[in-house]
Amino acid sequence: MEHVIGGKFKLGRKIGSGSFGELYLGVNIQSSEEVAIKLESVKSRHPQLHYESKLYMLLQGGTGIPHLKWFGVEGEYNVMVIDLLGPSLEDLFNYCNRKFSLKTVLMLADQMINRVEYMHTRGFLHRDIKPDNFLMGLGRKASQVYVIDYGLAKKYRDLQTHKHIPYRENKNLTGTARYASVNTHLGVEQSRRDDLESLGYVLMYFLRGSLPWQGLKAGTKKQKYDKISEKKMLTPVEVLCKSYPTEFISYFHYCRSLRFEDKPDYSYLKRLFRDLFIREGYQLDYIFDWTKQGSESNRLRSSGRTSGLVGPSAERTERAAARQDVPDRFSGTVDPFARRTGSGSGHYGEHTKHRNILDSLLAPKTAVDLDKRRPTSSSRNGSTSRKALLSSSRPSSGDPIDPNRSNLIPTSSGSSRPSTMQRLHQSTGLETRSSLTKTARNVHDDPTLRTFERLSISADRRK
């Protein structure tokens, strides 16, 4: 018996599950377009699909925001139908032997900052910035980064009055500890600065292969978070970014200099990385590391030398939790590409398991319109091997509250509140030096820089 959602979407095979419910492949019976269908029981103790669907509706129209196609109740389930997307950056990171080149990181950084900025302009914080929550598109959108998983997103200001949420302390850690900002560890209410600091950790994770606070052992989750927090605060950004371009140091210094209600200068941050991209002599061709890996895999397969690249069946199964060595993660993730209970878990030998599935998705070279307003619908040249990678996070019911967090650092209202840099100096005695000198060159004066804002090939014009 065929199940049709909303009279329009045929429910296909199950491709994932998580704490939020179940994820299915679907197809629009009118257009044959493949979609992703999320199901959540109406009896769920902590329903979030309705909230997430509202966020999708509020964010519709932004580049890199999946298109919400339908939401409603079918029988005993809340159902959300959205775009079918490709692999996450965590999957691609594993596929590329857990290291990204500087070129790939800079191309990703530009798009990722744009995605965070867009959410902020719509009045929301993401609050769970991590590689799993950034996905690549499929087909004509294969070079476009999408941001997903709005389960922890929070409205930080009123769009009409622009009134900002109040400063608070003693907040539980919300998000993923590995990428959480220093202020989040200290129990401070999150604001725009924290999303950007988290993004900085993601970028360094891609460049370095790991972060200094990974793999710390502790008896309890609270002790684990405390160890991560301590290590993070005791690691100067100069050490974190050692042997990498100083622009990454400047990025962190800037993010940590922001006060609670400050509006970040997103253009400055993008310009840091764009100028570095040009100075390194890179071409904005959207050939990522995995694009080259995919081309090499295809070449080897054609010559019959594929033994080292072929992984197991593409069908998703849950990896046993026995080797889950990263308890700093507490968001449920659906991942049909990787056999794991939590992606980004540091299983360094597992990257080859992703190759055969990812190879089928990665085109040798694809350029798309990344910065034009995305249309209300997108076409796909459907392949039955395509999969969805959609995740859903919710705060843990057991999030630890540090009893020593109250009045960690006395603050006053308004602009006199300390920045993260000042907090670090007060808390650890670390010396920090400012490197916030802004480049004088205007992005609009350089034709190469302008290509970051509009690509020469529009996906919507391609047939």
From Swiss-Prot:
The lineage of its organism: Eukaryota, Viridiplantae, Streptophyta, Embryophyta, Tracheophyta. Autophosphorylated. Its EC number is 2.7.11.1. One of its GO terms (biological process) is unidimensional cell growth. PROSITE patterns: PROTEIN_KINASE_ATP, PROTEIN_KINASE_DOM, PROTEIN_KINASE_ST. SUPFAM superfamilies: Protein kinase-like (PK-like). The keyword NAD does not apply. Casein kinases are operationally defined by their preferential utilization of acidic proteins such as caseins as substrates. Can phosphorylate casein in vitro. Required for normal root development through modulation of cell elongation. Plants silencing CKI1 show abnormal root development, with reduced number of lateral and adventitious roots, and shortened primary roots as a result of reduced cell elongation. May be involved in abscisic acid (ABA) and brassinosteroid (BR) signaling pathways. Plays an important role in the adaptive growth and fitness under low temperature (LT) conditions. InterPro entries: CK1_Ser-Thr_kinase, Kinase-like_dom_sf, Prot_kinase_dom, Protein_kinase_ATP_BS, Ser/Thr_kinase_AS. Monomer. Residues 9-278 form the Protein kinase domain. This is Casein kinase 1.
